């Protein structure tokens, strides 16, 4: 079957933003205008099409990023052919940053939504950082221009100040708050208005109001200057006072946006149906198609030092990245993939190159909001959900078995909070195991383990809301009732001293014995190394090289159990430099045990210390309650980093240990008569004070 839309007309984009910037409403409008959804869904009444999980509709926040396929010919049908959008709606709540990270990994471009009133909020900074990390070209859409206190140019200034990027507006707002009427298009130098009759479907173009002409000229000049910097030829033309044509300006802005040099900005009000069609036009005009970005890099599964790449081309070998796993009540597991190269037909066999396992693709579906269309094939650039995958986890590569490749792996953050869950009845016990297993497969930032001493099931995640929602899903989707314990902080441990330790494991008991012997030099790891930094300095074969991986494994396993209070040990450098072996009795197991024994001795010799997670906390409060809020943060061992004035009140930024933040939502509400709000996310690990370390060690026994 031939390709229906050429790959140059694909746009794989994400709509990302802070929790209340109006992202889901914007996605809804995208669906409405692209003709896929004929009745607009409103988040307010819990009917939004992309928010398909019950909890999302109740809480009015988006948890799972639904991938939706839609088509667009332009707000004024100005494109000769239809463009195909794959839109990923991502959550903006801090506890779900993992979802945003997974989506950004597979996108070619992003629309970052800001609220016209609140501007840059804490989560916007996180999302911006993640987009920088993956080099995602983006557009800024300042939404909610109809809200009290909305100001487009002020938000542009905040982005410059707090995110370190100077956006280039290609529109200006006409009016604001209740008087917001539309936009000035700085490319065509026309005013654009919207009709309620067609729900803001087709822009109405008129001359620019006289009182805004001077401002429009100034910002058009700013835009033209940004375009002229694309190359020397345009720069010379501009400096010599020649007019650049609109075609030249557009091409130059597109080139610079895709290169990540500039970020273009537009404005509107999704809720009031003023401006989303122009956002869609801007996506086509300025964000990349899969063929406009560099080929994706990967490695050879058999030899990680060999770098491979795949271009967005149907003729190349098939390769795709699984970026999301979802459980569907009707068809079982859906594996969402982004296809980077080649073609895959339903029924084809592929290999999961990370695990080295073969998989057969049963059926394939494409999502249109929450309807789904069964398709027979996917090609380079497509995003689709595969049904029938047996053992695929987020971040793994599916590819052609003859030409295997491992696409770049994703790094997932370690959880910072844990709670014990106990099934209410015997019947719930079995179901709980299955439910937790499925949820952990869907979400790599969620971990499940059994406490060996108490036999309790411990679940860990990225925040209280994260765990609340998973327990809620367990109840609804799997009918498992459970009791939840008090939240526990996930501490870490590290050593502070350098030391050399001998690990020796010798056992003689009739027949074949065990013999493993190694000397390891332990030290804190180099800057930026979170896990184990393992170095082999054994010379002269005193420890045969086939036993070296077993030594590494022994150290890693003991690190998981810690050496101070039973928490994982991080940032450890271990250099194996000497040892001995026995021709008959030595084996991998013996060396693993020897290394584990050596690591255990760090408790006495390594100057171990306990680390506690520190959260970046941002509280927005009316000025009247500022003193109380700050005093309370100080009592919680918080460090105030600074504050600033915003339309919504004073913003206090602080770093506070997670252990002091449980129940903060209730406390901050009662302190401010319900008027303050806060957000927090994990920032770093710091040495825990002695009294905390002592309490924790006692508790761990």
Swiss-Prot record:
Q: Where in the cell is it found?
A: Cytoplasm
Q: Name one GO cellular component term.
A: cytoplasm
Question: GO terms for biological process?
Answer: ribosome disassembly
> Domain named tr-type G: which ranges?
8-291
Q: Which domain of life is it from?
A: Bacteria
What Gene3D superfamilies would the database entry show? 3.30.230.10, 3.30.70.240, Elongation Factor G (Translational Gtpase), domain 3 (3.30.70.870), P-loop containing nucleotide triphosphate hydrolases (3.40.50.300), Translation factors (2.40.30.10)
Q: Which residues form a coiled coil?
A: none
| Any one GO molecular-function label of the UniProt entry | translation elongation factor activity
**NCBIfam families per UniProt:** EF-G, PRK12740.1-5, small_GTP
Q: What does this protein do?
A: Catalyzes the GTP-dependent ribosomal translocation step during translation elongation. During this step, the ribosome changes from the pre-translocational (PRE) to the post-translocational (POST) state as the newly formed A-site-bound peptidyl-tRNA and P-site-bound deacylated tRNA move to the P and E sites, respectively. Catalyzes the coordinated movement of the two tRNA molecules, the mRNA and conformational changes in the ribosome.
The UniProt family comment states:
Belongs to the TRAFAC class translation factor GTPase superfamily. Classic translation factor GTPase family. EF-G/EF-2 subfamily.
Identification of the protein by name = Elongation factor G
Q: What is the lineage of its organism?
A: Bacteria, Pseudomonadati, Pseudomonadota, Gammaproteobacteria, Pseudomonadales
The gene behind this protein is: fusA
């Amino acid at each position: 079957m031939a390709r229906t839309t050429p790959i140059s007309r694909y746009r794989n984009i994400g709509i990302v933003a802070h929790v209340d910037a109006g992202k889901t409403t914007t996605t809804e409008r995208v669906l409405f205008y692209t003709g896929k959804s004929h009745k607009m869904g409103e988040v307010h009444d819990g009917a939004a099409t992309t928010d398909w999980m019950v909890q999302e509709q109740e809480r009015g926040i988006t948890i799972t990023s639904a991938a939706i396929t839609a088509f667009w010919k332009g707000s004024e049908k100005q494109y000769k052919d239809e463009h195909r959008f794959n839109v990923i709606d991502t959550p903006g709540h801090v506890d779900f940053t993992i979802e945003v990270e997974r989506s950004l990994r597979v996108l070619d471009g992003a629309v970052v939504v800001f609220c016209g009133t609140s501007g840059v909020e804490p989560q916007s900074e996180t999302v911006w950082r993640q987009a920088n990390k993956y080099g995602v070209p983006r557009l800024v859409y300042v939404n909610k221009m109809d809200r009290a206190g909305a100001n487009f140019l002020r938000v542009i200034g905040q982005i410059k100040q707090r995110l370190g990027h100077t956006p280039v507006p290609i529109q200006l707002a006409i009016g604001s708050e209740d008087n917001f009427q539309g936009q000035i298009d700085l490319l065509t130098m026309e005013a654009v208005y919207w009709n309620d009759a067609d729900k803001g479907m087709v822009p109405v173009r008129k001359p620019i109001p006289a009182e805004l002409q001077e401002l429009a000229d100034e910002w058009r000049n700013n835009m033209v200057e940004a375009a002229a910097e694309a190359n020397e030829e345009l720069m010379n033309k501009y400096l010599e006072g020649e007019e650049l044509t609109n075609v030249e300006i557009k091409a130059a802005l597109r080139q610079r946006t895709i290169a990540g040099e500039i970020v273009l900005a537009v404005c509107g009000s999704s809720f009031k149906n003023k401006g989303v069609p122009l956002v869609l036009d801007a996506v086509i005009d300025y964000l990349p198609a899969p063929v406009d970005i560099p080929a994706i890099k990967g490695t050879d599964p058999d030899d990680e030092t060999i770098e491979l790449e795949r271009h967005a081309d149907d003729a190349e070998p098939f390769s795709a990245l699984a970026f999301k796993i979802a459980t569907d009540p009707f068809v079982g597991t859906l594996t969402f993939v982004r296809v980077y190269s080649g073609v895959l037909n339903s029924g084809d066999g592929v290999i999961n190159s990370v695990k080295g396992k073969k998989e057969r693709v049963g059926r394939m579906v494409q999502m249109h909001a929450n309807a789904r269309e069964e398709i027979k094939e996917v090609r380079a650039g497509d995003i689709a959900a595969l049904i029938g995958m047996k053992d695929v986890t987020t971040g793994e590569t599916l590819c052609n078995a003859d030409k295997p490749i491992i696409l770049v792996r994703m790094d997932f953050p370690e959880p910072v909070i844990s709670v014990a869950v106990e099934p209410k009845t015997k019947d719930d016990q079995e179901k709980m195991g299955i439910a937790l297993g499925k949820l952990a497969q869907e979400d790599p930032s969620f971990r499940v383990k059994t406490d060996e001493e108490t036999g309790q099931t411990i679940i860990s995640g990225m925040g209280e809301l994260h765990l609340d929602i998973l327990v809620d899903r367990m109840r609804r989707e799997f009918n498992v009732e459970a009791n939840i314990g008090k939240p526990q902080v996930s501490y870490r441990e590290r050593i502070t001293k350098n030391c050399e330790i001998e690990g020796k494991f010798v056992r003689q008991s009739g027949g074949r014995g065990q013999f493993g012997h190694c000397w390891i030099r332990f030290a804190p790891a180099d800057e930026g190394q979170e896990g184990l930094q393992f170095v082999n300095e054994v010379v002269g074969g005193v420890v045969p090289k086939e036993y070296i991986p077993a030594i590494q494994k022994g150290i890693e396993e003991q690190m998981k159990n810690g050496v101070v209070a039973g928490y994982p040990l991080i940032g450890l450098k271990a250099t194996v430099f000497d040892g001995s072996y026995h021709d008959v009795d030595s084996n991998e197991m013996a060396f693993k045990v020897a290394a584990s024994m050596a690591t255990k001795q760090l408790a006495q010799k390594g100057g171990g210390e306990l680390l506690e997670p520190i959260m970046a906390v941002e509280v927005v409060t009316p000025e009247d309650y500022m003193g109380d809020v700050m005093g309370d943060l100080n009592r919680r061992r918080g460090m105030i980093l600074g504050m600033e004035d915003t339309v919504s009140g004073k913003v206090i930024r602080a770093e506070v240990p997670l252990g002091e933040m449980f129940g903060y939502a209730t406390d901050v509400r009662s302190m401010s008569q319900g008027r303050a709000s806060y957000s927090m996310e994990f920032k770093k690990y710091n040495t825990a004070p002695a009294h905390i370390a002592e309490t924790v060690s006692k508790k761990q026994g």
